[in-house]
């Protein structure tokens, strides 16, 4: 029987939310060159995949965290999935901007969140952890308790693992880079000779 990590990896590869190009690396927004590109927003266009991810995120939250008061999504990639999960769990939803609005109330957190609330943050993708932990800090600065973060995918970079540990935040992901590589080889998306470039 397949693990959750493998099932999610299979779905992400199938809809091309994850692309692997060992011979022609992608350039990320950070300027890094990488043989993998992940765009989990694509999952929203596939009802079966979208629903599967929503159900699994909700299951993880229900199993790992007690007495959650609200769900927060990190803008922009986790807004839709976060709202779907909050709806399924019957919880309030807010989203966290990367920077405050430059007009109006200049909010960093959009929606109604009560100070003292226990919040689970949903993220679509964790790479270095920088933007994810910035969202955690915004919720903490608002006077709320961050129970943890749940994400669809992580690259598993050691720098991110260390950053989450330093910030005392539990990170749980549905899938990861290693699971994608295993699934990509199993389904012949890539061949064994390309693995060395990808590891």
Question: What is each model feature region?
Answer:
Residues 31, 71, 93:
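Conserved hydrophobic/aromatic pocket- or pore-lining residues that grip, position, or stack substrates
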Residues 76, 82-120, 128-134:
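Short, glycine/charge-rich flexible loops or terminal/linker lids adjacent to PRPP-binding catalytic cores
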Residues 1-65:
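Active-site-facing substrate-recognition patch
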Residues 69, 117, 147:
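Conserved acidic residues
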Residues 66-75, 150:
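Short glycine-rich phosphate-binding loop at a beta-alpha junction
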Residues 2-14, 137-199:
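PRPP-dependent phosphoribosyltransferase catalytic core
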Residues 57-69, 136-142:
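Phosphate/pyrophosphate-binding loops at sites that engage ATP/ADP/AMP, CoA/4′-phosphopantetheine
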